């Protein structure tokens, strides 16, 4: 189902700045207005490992005009089997800086801001204030919950993705439209990230995340509000589960004006 968006006049100067030859294959789906929305949007990609690396590449290639890339880590040899923005010459460099350089080559018109810092609640708040959409490329739940809380306060959509081995999941959360990310968080959000992954898994999951972001920015398609896409690539199969928010402690706490994740999760 296509979400109805408010009609807006075409900005002729903005169209002239677009290289429509680059985006000709997607204009039939998004239209010129949709492409202009992408070019005027800002997306924060948090975590530039397997998921965030590919998500950033697809977003830049699709014509998103401004990207914020957040990751404190440096490139390691074990990243190179799936994190295609890096090469052997990037080992030891900050992921955010190396990715920004590569994306600048892919889309010279885009504004790309590398942030080689660790995510904390204050940075999550800054990202939620600045970005139109936040894309989760993280590998730990506590950091995801910081993003969830900040995006909820700011009323910004957060696209969540996770991948391990040959499995993954994707959903979109937004205040007033869906349950929150805490509804599907594990009981121990400080659980370590995955250590076993194969490149095609992050390719599939990151593609679904980018599609969610494009839906949100253009109004084309139906985001996964209150639904969780569960991906099993051993079969392969994608099952979409309905999410309920009947007794989510975080949702109830927010409705009552509380935001204490530490007390909610015992961390």
Where are each of the predicted segments found?
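N-terminal charged helix/coil linker that caps or initiates catalytic domains
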Residues: 1-44, 259-267
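Glycine-rich phosphate-binding loop and adjoining beta1-alpha1-beta2 segment
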Residues: 6-11, 64-107
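Generic hydrophobic/aromatic pocket-lining and core-packing "Φ" positions
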Residues: 35, 56-57, 148
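Structural alpha-helical scaffold elements that stabilize or flank donor/cofactor-binding regions
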Residues: 37, 126-127
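Conserved N-terminal Rossmann-fold NAD(P)-binding element of oxidoreductases
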Residues: 46-47, 70
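Hydrophobic/small residue at the entry helix of a nucleotide-binding pocket
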Residues: 51
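Hydrophobic residues within alpha-helices
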Residues: 55-56, 99
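E1/E1-like adenylate-forming module used to activate ubiquitin-like modifiers
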Residues: 112-114, 119-120, 127-208, 212-220, ...
């Amino acid at each position: 189902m296509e979400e109805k968006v408010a009609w807006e006049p075409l900005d002729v100067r903005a169209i002239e700045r677009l290289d429509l030859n680059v985006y000709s294959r997607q204009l039939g789906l998004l239209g010129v207005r949709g492409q202009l929305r992408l070019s005027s949007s800002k997306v924060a990609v948090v975590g530039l490992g397997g998921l965030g690396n590919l998500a950033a590449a697809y977003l830049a290639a699709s014509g998103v005009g401004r990207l914020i890339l957040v990751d404190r880590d440096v490139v390691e040899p074990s990243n190179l089997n799936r994190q295609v923005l890096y090469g052997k010459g990037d080992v030891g460099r900050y992921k955010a800086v190396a990715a920004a350089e590569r994306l600048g080559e892919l889309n010279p018109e885009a504004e790309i801001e590398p942030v080689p810092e660790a995510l904390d609640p204050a940075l999550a708040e800054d990202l939620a204030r600045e970005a139109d959409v936040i894309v989760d490329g993280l590998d730990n739940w506590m950091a995801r919950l910081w993003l969830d809380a900040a995006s909820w306060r700011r009323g910004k959509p957060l696209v969540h993705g996770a991948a391990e081995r040959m499995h993954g999941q994707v959903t979109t959360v937004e205040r007033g439209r869906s349950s929150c990310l805490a509804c599907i968080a594990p009981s121990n959000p400080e659980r370590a990230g995955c250590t076993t992954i194969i490149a095609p898994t992050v390719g599939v999951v990151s593609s679904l995340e980018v599609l969610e972001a494009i839906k949100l920015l253009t109004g084309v398609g139906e985001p996964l509000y209150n639904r969780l896409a569960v991906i099993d690539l051993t079969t392969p199969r994608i099952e979409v589960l309905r999410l309920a928010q009947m007794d989510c402690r975080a949702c109830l706490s927010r409705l009552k004006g509380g935001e204490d994740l530490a007390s909610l999760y015992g961390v």
